[in-house]
Amino acid sequence: LPHCLGYNNIVIVCGPGNNGADGLSLGIKLHIRARNVKLYCFGNPNKFSQANNFYIEQAQEMEVPITFMDEEDISLFISDAQKADVVIDAMFGFGLNGEVRGVARILIEEINNLYDIDIIAIDIPTGLNPDTGIPYGNVI
């Protein structure tokens, strides 16, 4: 949280697991502190972690802007990310055990194209092997 308080316009991209739940929780805390936060979630909602579902409900109750994204919504994410002060990677953390595919892979590519915007990863950058530090494939 302290690393993010210097930013006003914040985009957080959240995966379906507990790393995504951490991003959602952070987004709520920043929203409470009057930051302009936009949350983007991807994945099958039926497979979201219990913590993820809890924070999604909390974010919706607090009216934090949240978008459930598939490939058709990536252009909206890109538009918001380009206007942000920081993009927070809460897609995958220490639980990742292979190459990232689908929407997450596209998001990695798009986030890597944001040259003038700070990027902060929760845990570790998505796509990085947590044991070896070697990328599985695409990595933020």
What residues fall within each predicted segment?
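N-terminal glycine-/serine-/threonine-rich phosphate-binding loop
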Residues: 1
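Glycine-rich phosphate/dinucleotide-binding loop and adjoining beta-alpha-beta core of small-molecule
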Residues: 4-140
